[in-house]
Amino acid sequence: GPRTRRVKRSHNGKNGSPEEKRPRTAFSAEQLARLKREFAENRYLTERRRQQLSRDLGLTEAQIKIWFQNKRAKIKKASGQKNPLALQLMAQGLYNHSTVPVDEDGEEI
């Protein structure tokens, strides 16, 4: 199965008890190769396909689902696609999560 890393626990402000954070999954080379192959065939999984991958790879369905979500998000970010609502809000000057420096008029420097 996948290896997981130890987690440093942070204390939350309310009751001082450590917040449980799920450790990051370290996929094996074989698991990654299979996930990438499946993703190349289809960027979205059916429930049946997710269950089959879970059995084949020794991962939970949630781990597989999240891997696919993260992979889609990474591709979307790399391709520069913008959400239509984000574009509309940016046009109104209400939304800018860009890391490009801009002047006081919102023009790129």
UniProtKB/Swiss-Prot annotation:
Signal peptide range equals none
A GO CC annotation given for this chain: nucleus
Q: Which family does it belong to?
A: Belongs to the engrailed homeobox family.
The name on file for this protein is Homeobox protein E30
Say if the entry is tagged with keyword Acyltransferase: no
Give GO MF terms, alphabetically: DNA-binding transcription factor activity, RNA polymerase II-specific; RNA polymerase II cis-regulatory region sequence-specific DNA binding
What superkingdom heads the lineage? Eukaryota
Note the DNA-binding span(s) on this chain: 20-79
Its source organism is Apis mellifera (Honeybee)
InterPro entries per UniProt:
Engrailed_Homeobox_TFs, HD, HD_engrailed, HD_metazoa, Homeobox-engrailed_C-terminal, Homeobox-engrailed_CS, Homeobox_CS, Homeodomain-like_sf
Query: What keywords were assigned to this record?
Result: Developmental protein, DNA-binding, Homeobox, Nucleus
A family per Pfam: Engrail_1_C_sig
